[in-house]
Amino acid sequence: MPATRKPMRYGHTEGHTEVCFDDSGSFIVTCGSDGDVRIWEDLDDDDPKFINVGEKAYSCALKSGKLVTAVSNNTIQVHTFPEGVPDGILTRFTTNANHVVFNGDGTKIAAGSSDFLVKIVDVMDSSQQKTFRGHDAPVLSLSFDPKDIFLASASCDGSVRVWQISDQTCAISWPLLQKCNDVINAKSICRLAWQPKSGKLLAIPVEKSVKLYRRESWSHQFDLSDNFISQTLNIVTWSPCGQYLAAGSINGLIIVWNVETKDCMERVKHEKGYAICGLAWHPTCGRISYTDAEGNLGLLENVCDPSGKTSSSKVSSRVEKDYNDLFDGDDMSNAGDFLNDNAVEIPSFSKGIINDDEDDEDLMMASGRPRQRSHILEDDENSVDISMLKTGSSLLKEEEEDGQEGSIHNLPLVTSQRPFYDGPMPTPRQKPFQSGSTPLHLTHRFMVWNSIGIIRCYNDEQDNAIDVEFHDTSIHHATHLSNTLNYTIADLSHEAILLACESTDELASKLHCLHFSSWDSSKEWIIDLPQNEDIEAICLGQGWAAAATSALLLRLFTIGGVQKEVFSLAGPVVSMAGHGEQLFIVYHRGTGFDGDQCLGVQLLELGKKKKQILHGDPLPLTRKSYLAWIGFSAEGTPCYVDSEGIVRMLNRGLGNTWTPICNTREHCKGKSDHYWVVGIHENPQQLRCIPCKGSRFPPTLPRPAVAILSFKLPYCQIATEKGQMEEQFWRSVIFHNHLDYLAKNGYEYEESTKNQATKEQQELLMKMLALSCKLEREFRCVELADLMTQNAVNLAIKYASRSRKLILAQKLSELAVEKAAELTATQVEEEEEEEDFRKKLNAGYSNTATEWSQPRFRNQVEEDAEDSGEADDEEKPEIHKPGQNSFSKSTNSSDVSAKSGAVTFSSQGRVNPFKVSASSKEPAMSMNSARSTNILDNMGKSSKKSTALSRTTNNEKSPIIKPLIPKPKPKQASAASYFQKRNSQTNKTEEVKEENLKNVLSETPAICPPQNTENQRPKTGFQMWLEENRSNILSDNPDFSDEADIIKEGMIRFRVLSTEERKVWANKAKGETASEGTEAKKRKRVVDESDETENQEEKAKENLNLSKKQKPLDFSTNQKLSAFAFKQE
């Protein structure tokens, strides 16, 4: 039977760790760099006894009830065993002692230290000491001859010496090791060992083999090696019977040889490849306890029988099968269980010549095709090396029959056999876990700790219960539940408590929800899963619950217990988290190699419009790490933490990528310290976690205290002022992306928070620009200005001008113009997208009034109604062009005059995007925002309804079109009733409109309403220049069809003009505006009121009959009409 490896468990903090058995084999004793000696009853002992012997313990030895330790205060101490009572100090050194061993009867100890000395001390009388001098470097290891005649020692000076104890002389010295100046720099600690009982052989690990020397003659007998050994051997130890020798390497390989036959009996690989630094053979049975350089403790069982025979008469494990077993999902997933402590049997490599019939069966693939033997073995199984037959024929023995078919013969392993390819090795899959929980094997554990509360589980002899505690007791009071169904998974939200248990032979896996926020009397529900399907992960959201099962299914439920969607996962689930409408799933998307996990992530939104944000993208992890925590920030951004302490957050502003925002290991004082994350906040920026000294998770008692860590992005040169400001700027950007997400999805947030963040970011950019300007990095200044808002760019231009950086100021001015043009182009595109969207909604339903049909017309009607209500006590009907499409490109919000029906040019209300204004509060105003602002300024007593509707036209605040249903008001409803679209109008309606029109026109002879005239701005010099040169631009560029192209070309030509020419055009614009105003005033005085009324009646009738055919007037006409109306006010 091959050796069985049990999963390793945490023993001590990271560093050199040693292990030994007591005389009876009842206890395993370990010591480590944490200064503790732990006494384990077995590997499953969850509460080992410990003795603190000092700050660090470098070595320990146990014999006859005496525990001897070499500690960091340069002493060799004695404690009673197992009581752990101090029993004095045996000896002292000037530096640390590196190794201590007992002799055969336990009366003496030998210790070697870094001061080059070796001492033998009598345990009962510490004054009886012998000192051995001769090494020229620190002593690595020691070993007593079983007959107490010789003492062997290895040193950093590269030599292995054998001392005559009686006269303290060196009997022999071999230069076998690499030289070094300290133990920490030694490639191997070279733990050598004498053969028990007879002391016939001395085993020394040298490089990749074990050298054996004969006693007294000191001749080299032979080497023990294996083709699987790829790294230096660190330690050797003999079985109590003296027939087997075990060795451990610095890459985690443990090999056992039969010394007599030189056969390799067992090969076992450390599950994580850590260096083996402690090996101890059980005194009575075939068990080997081992420790690694990370402080972990492991155990091999059924290694070899102490009587000299293997524990199984036949070698049933074959190398081909072992290689296939590496990819066995069930066994390997248990082998790398980070959170569960169940024993896993992993067969080791055992040598043997394979029977032909059995070999054919084992070489069959899952698909039914035979595996090519050439991929596994170099030679046929029937071919045997001649040299092997000559040297091993005397060792060929036929084994006893044990009921199995065929006979298998053991032959010595020869170097001519080609080794199997050992890499890359697949990484054991991480088992499912619940974020905020501690391991299942603990009797008192946290089932979950999150921002809502804590769920503890107690499973001991007295009680099996679950306690629920809320951080805010106003949500719910603390609850105590009996755990009769053995619930192992839990989650907690402000609405419910969710529990799940695995299936048993009698009961199915269950999902239990305690819906304490329900308004009815039924506060809980339970759902049984189908047979052979277990719940592996659960989570709660707002109004829903989710459970991932072993059948690779994810089941969704309402919080009240209604089953909803069920869909398949692409791999076994690792963990889940929920927040609001978001569901965050991490699963295995493949097999990882060389210690890396291969995980995928899905992010779904389960609102009314269900959609998937992340479609199984790979989840980035630190090398050789695993997932430790997933969840959401308090603001709803997905985050996760790996076992190396790296916290990553979803960066929605960079294509949903993952950005590392904190390294918790930087805040740890010791190498074995960790932080256990319980929550993340973006505003304020806080990482809430629990410090764990010497562990990865906290105990339940005493109640752990939560610490707050700050975030820091891993930017370069963080010690410099430039690096600090860059890190602060991008951290501010990342941690305020959630505001855009909230606005996009219709959630409420404080506008002041966003304004404060923008202000903070612009201040950092200005500081970086000033720093770059001082360092003569003008190109870098322009790059920084590209990240600024329009106002900040204006400040940057002023700063550059005052700093006499004229070229920089010119570049920044060009950048400001480009940013304004880009902003205008973006707004035009958004308007076109909005029009296309609404056209699609109205496609095929041109005569059907919808909520999207004419929102701009609604706004106009409501504004006119408000104005008319303020001007007159009576409501008066107004004229609008029937059947006009508000969303066509030829018209917009300002193209139809509400009172007169006159048409104005569509760009009259738009701010010049190419004019840089330092006094403006916003970088640039879109047409809609400018229009809304002016309307709000005019409406002194504006209602909530009109305000809400005007806000919908602001593209900056509402990037996504969403219908707003206004509350009905009698006044506005009556005013709007005059403007409903009708396909057929009666003569009576026309007559009523004509009469009302006469009354309106007689009282108000204006051409345009006040709210539209206030949007008119004086012409600029560039506009007048563009009017006169438009024909030249079109003749030079006949392919120009878009007004934006004409304006851009005009800007380029206008910049070429000299300063004097530009001033001439500017003065011309001012003069024309003034003259137009004067002319309007004169016309108002001259025109006779009666004649004007008749003319207006005729024009109104024409407009009513020809409203659909009328085209917009040219630019100059609209300008004059607007100015005329403005002056009439």
From Swiss-Prot:
Chain positions of cross-link Glycyl lysine isopeptide (Lys-Gly) (interchain with G-Cter in SUMO2): K397, K1127
WD repeats: 11-50, 52-91, 92-131, 134-173, 184-223, 228-267, 271-310
Pfam families, A to Z: Ctf4_C, HMG_WDHD1, Mcl1_mid, WD40_WDHD1_1st
DNA-binding region per Swiss-Prot/TrEMBL record: 1016-1079
InterPro entries: HMG-box_WDHD1, HMG_box_dom, HMG_box_dom_sf, WD40/YVTN_repeat-like_dom_sf, WD40_repeat_CS, WD40_repeat_dom_sf, WD40_rpt, WDHD1/CFT4_beta-prop_2nd
Post-translational modification Phosphoserine, affected residues: S333, S374, S383, S387, S868, S917, S919, S932, S984, S1041, S1090
SMART domains according to UniProt: HMG, WD40
Subunit structure: Trimer. Interacts with the polymerase alpha catalytic subunit POLA1. Interacts with MCM10. Interacts with DNA2. Interacts with CDC45 and GINS2 subunit of GINS complex; these interactions associate WDHD1 with the CMG helicase complex.
PANTHER family: WD REPEAT AND HMG-BOX DNA BINDING PROTEIN, WD REPEAT AND HMG-BOX DNA-BINDING PROTEIN 1
Protein name listed in UniProt: WD repeat and HMG-box DNA-binding protein 1
Disordered: annotated span: 848-897, 916-1017, 1068-1113
Broad class of the protein's primary localization: nucleus
